[in-house]
Structures are given as C-alpha cells and as structure tokens.
Amino acid sequence: MHTSSLGPHPGRRTRCAAAITLALLSFHYPAFAQQAAVSDNAGLETINVSGDWLGSGLENSVKTYPGARTVAKKEDIERSGAISIGDLLRRIPGVQASDNSGSAGSAIALNIGVRGLTGRYSPRSTILLDGIPLASAPYGQPQLSFAPLSLNNIESVDVIRGGGAVRYGPQNVGGIINFKTRSIPTGPGISGDAALRYNSYGQGGGNTQYSAFAGGQSDNGFGMAFLYSGQEGSGWRNKSDERVNDFALKMRYEISPTSELYAKLSYYDVLSRTPGGLTVAQYNADPFQNTRQRDNWSGTRKGFDIGYLNTISDSQEFEIRTYFNQASRQSTLVNAAGTSLAHQPRNYETVGIEPRYTQRFALGGTTNDVTVGYRYIRERGDDNAYNEAVATGALSGFTTFQNSTDAHAAYVDDKIAFGKWRVTPGLRFEHIQSTRYDVNNKATFQVANNKPLPSINVAYLLTEQLTLFSNYNTSFGVVQNTQLNTMSASNPLSPELAKTIEGGARWKSAQVSAEATVFHIDFDNQIASIPGTTPSVFRNLGKTRHDGIELVLDYAFDKESILKGWSAYANYTYTRALQKSGANSGKDVPFYSRTTDTVGARFQSGPWGLNLSTTHQGRQFSDEANTVAESADGSTGEIPGFRIWNAQVNWKMPGAKGFDVFAGVNNLTDRRYFTRTTDGNLGKLVGAPRTLYVQGRYAF
C-alpha cells in the first residue's frame, strides 16, 4: 500500500529546533546601522512603496491605497486569540472562513471566501506567502487543500479586497491575501522569542502549539533568522489527531546602502485525521463523534526563494526574484459502506521568476511612477488515485494523470500623481498553455489562453487624514487540471472572467481609523460541474453577481479621559451574492452569509491587557436551490447563523523583561453551531466548542 512520506518524528524536530536556536544564540552580532531610507520626493511615497504595493512601507501605502485593504499585524494576531489562520481571517470585513470542505477544522487546508465567492479551499483569491503564490500549482490547481502555513511564523497579514489585479493576477476576483513571515532583526546582537500555547477544547481533546524565532545581523551586512512553528494534539472531534512542523531559514545580505540579496529556505509537513461529516441522526446523538476513523490527509512541501532588490536612486528601483517548491499531498477516505479506502496522492513541482522595474519621472504637472514586470511560472505534477479493500488490503483502480502548465504574464502600470489625485491605469496580459495526459488511456488534453486584464485605480487625498478611492479591475480563472479532460470539440472550456468595481473612503488619525467600501462584482463564464455526471463533466455555465458594503471602525479613547487605556473596534459587512444563470437564478450562492460583523473592546494599563470581542455570521444554504429542509445525510439544508463571544487577558511579568502570558476563552457561552460539507465525506460538521487557552512567551 502506498503511504506518504511524512519525515522524522515531531519530537526529533522539536529538539532540532531547540538546537538551531541555541546555535544562533552562541554567536554575537555587533550593532549594524540600518539601511539608509530613500528620500521622499515632494511628499510622495518612496519608490519602494510605489514599486511593490505588498512590500515595504506598508503603513504609508495602506493609508493612500486606492482600494479596500486591511492589515493585521503581529500584536493584532496575538490579541485576537486565534488558534488558526481561519480564526484570524473571519474577523476581517468581507472575508468568511467557510470550513465547508471534508478536511474542515484541520490545519492542512485553508477555506476562505471573500465577498460571497466560494470558500472551499480558497480558489478565488490569490494567496501569497512573502509575495510568492502559496498554492502548489497556482494556475493548474489554485485550491488550498494543502496550505503550508502556520500562524506563529506570521508577522502580518495584508488583505487587499480590490485594486490589485494588475500586479497579482490572474485568479484574484476574491482579492489578494499576503502572509508575511517574521523579519530578520536589524538591531544589535541576537534577538528572538520562544512560545508555548495549550488549547483545551470543551469537547474532544486539546493540542499544544510551540514556536521559536531567533536572528540577527552582523556589521558586514549579513543577517539570518530561524523560524519554527509546530503543533501536536487533537481538535474538538474524537480522534482528530494532528501534527504540524513548519521551518524556515531566512537570509539577507546588504550589498550596499541601497541594494540587498535575500533568500529563504522552508520545509513544512502535516498529518491530519479528518472526522468528516455526520448524518442528522449521528449529529443528534453526538456531534463530536468520529465515524470515519481511517480518514486522513497528509502533505509535505520544500521551498526555496532568492531575490535581489536595488533602489538605484530616488527615482529608480529594480527587483528580481525566483522561487521553487516541491510538494506532495495525499488524502485517504473510506467509502460509505466502510469497505474501501480511496487514496489520492498528488505531487507538484513549481518554478517561478519575477523581474520588476519602477521608474519615476515628471511629465508636465504630473509625477509618474511607471512599473513594468514579468512573471513566468512552470508547473509540473501528477494526480494519482487507487482503492484499497479494507478487508484484504488488495489494491485496484489505479489511475494517473500528468499535468503541465507554462504561464507567462507581463504587466505595466503608471501611478500618476497630480495635486491630491493618484490615478493608476494598468494592464496585465496572460499567456497560459496547459496540458493534461491520461496515462491509462494515453489521451492528451490541451488548452491555450491569452487574456488582457485592464484596470484603473483612483485615489483622492482629500485631507491628510481622509482618502477617497475607486477602482475597476478585471480578473480571470484558468481552466484547471482536473477540468481539462472533460473538454471536447462540442465542449470547449474557456477561462472564467470577473469584473469588479468598488468605491470608498478611508480615515486615519491619531485616535480614529475607519473605512467604508461599496463593491460590485460580475463573475461570468464560471466553470461548473454538471450534476449527476460520473466522472464529473465541466462546462462554462455559471454566472454570479456580488454586491455589498463593508464598514470598519477602530477608536482609541483620549489618554486624558476617564476611559484612558480603552479602545473599541467594529466591522460590518453586508453581501448579496446571487446566482444569475440556470434554474436557480436569483437565489443565493451556497455557503456564504449575507451579514457578518465583529465588535470588541481592548484595555491596556501597565502590564495588564484585556480584550473582549464577539463575531457573528448570518444563515447560509448548502445547495444552489437554497433548500431549507434538512436531508437525512446532513449535507443539504439551511445552516443557521450564530454569534460567539471571546475574551482574553494578557500580562507582562514585572521584573522579568521579555516574559508575558496570554490566557483566554473562545466561544465563552459554548454556543453550538455547525456547517455542512458536500464532499465525499458529506454531512454536518460541528463548530469549535468553548475553548480555553494559555500561552507563555519569553523574548530576548
């Protein structure tokens, strides 16, 4: 029987992490003068802000960015009490963590839907890690059924819901989400921290999360940082054991005050036992039980990236980076009768290269920042499947498909500044060649796509605090690997196309941060599976329309008032996502809520901090027909809305510099809520019960 390679035992990895951390601590790095900042030009952003919207100069670029954008920094992540990436992202306006896949609740997958778009494995957003696509095959399989990402290694999360299609296409109708790993320290000596957290679920079990970070920079300009994050234990379902190891080694060498080389080596492995869905009768008897104890997902990914950045002058910047990753993932799922196991091992290799150049020049009464860039991605991989008889272990039904994609993208945009206006027209052009070869039947399926994607972003800096913005962007989704072999002369598949318009306002002052955005998305030509076809047949059938409003407010009370130390925050999203084709035209898209909100308050006084928050999502439907009545298997029916409350306290130990403790409760009232999955392990999936956690961290 085929089994996936999961690497060494986690205990040995933990000892390895400690050894590397101690090795780093054994060196002394003298203080290093930080790189001189590029001078500001007539009040405009520096080139490295204009040249890379998701790169340096984050806060300045957010303030005047011409689209809806939210950034969560390290302290925001810690105060949220989030256990997983999904926990964190569901607090961001317009974002819903759907958890409606068969591996929901585990660490292996990411299920994020933006503005009513499907959230199962996050296929409609461009998900990046340090600006590099996170998906193992960004074009051929953008779904994140395997998401090699750990919350403890993340320094910030940048969620751009509109306005970024030119730089980060093509699959971004649901925006761009960039996870930035922790930066290499530039201060004197070695600095870092180690943390240990235990999560205790009111039902099921508990898990331990641990992390280590250490790094520094020498006086010759060479810097290094080691990152490790791990997890062991179980979730809130019976026999939902899980193991995660996430390593990264980052390096940077400052060649001159304006140029640098940077690189990162990474390794990730995960094993998750996934309980799957329950029938209505099983859920009523015990929503936390596991009737599929043989089901599991596993994955391994190794990656390397290297780049060169040169801020040539106040008006020029050049950057080039290349990256490589090798990944494998496997799912094992038992059939309904419990007699057969379906194994699906998949392997991927992806190589990419991205050069970019930005030039600033004056033309008439305007200042222009013109950026030209190119990206080539080469994907190779194979999808395999076979069955194993539970009683005898006999293997049968072997199938193999070999996949290849070569994607070329070129883009140009010009940020034109005149007076208080910032107008950025842009164009991205994609040329994609994809091939899928059926090894068993010796059949080849091919498709070539060429697509121009125009956009325009506009910002008006009304005052120092207030920015008005609007944008129009186009994006598209390519024909994916698993869809290629259903193509024929009578059923030619073409890319999905989306057009997005949004407008809004952003306020930023010492005490108040606020943003209001309205949006409209027309998403046409969606590739949909024809119901009742086995194997699945795909056609260009789907059309949906999404519109809504997103509101965000963060207020810090005056330091001289009676409420000094207090701050309050809130966000609210209303989304209407409707099907516009077929028999269910006019009905809601499945697995999204029309309304979501988060409301909370923070208090900080000396070493003590307190955070109280609540999140809410409205009802959902699990099928296109918006069926309210529940089916016996639990896969179909209304999904009621729910509200949960969370509380956290944090404390910095006096006299023990660098030591702090976080403790809290998620789902304070132990609200019972659920979603559904229509995957092969279909049924009802209970949400997390009341969860207590405590974390200790020592920073040096």
Predicted region positions:
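C-terminal beta-signal and adjacent terminal beta-strands/loops
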Residues: 2-4, 619-625, 651-700
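Extracytoplasmic beta-strand/coil segments of soluble accessory domains associated
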Residues: 86, 90-133
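Short acidic/polar hinge/loop motifs at secondary-structure boundaries
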Residues: 132-161
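Transmembrane beta-barrel wall of Gram-negative outer-membrane proteins
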Residues: 204-232, 236-274, 296-311, 454
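Face-selective signature of the C-terminal outer-membrane beta-barrel domain
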Residues: 254, 258-262, 266, 298-439, ...
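Surface-exposed extracellular loop regions of Gram-negative outer-membrane beta-barrel proteins
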Residues: 271-285, 378-389, 433-436, 446, ...
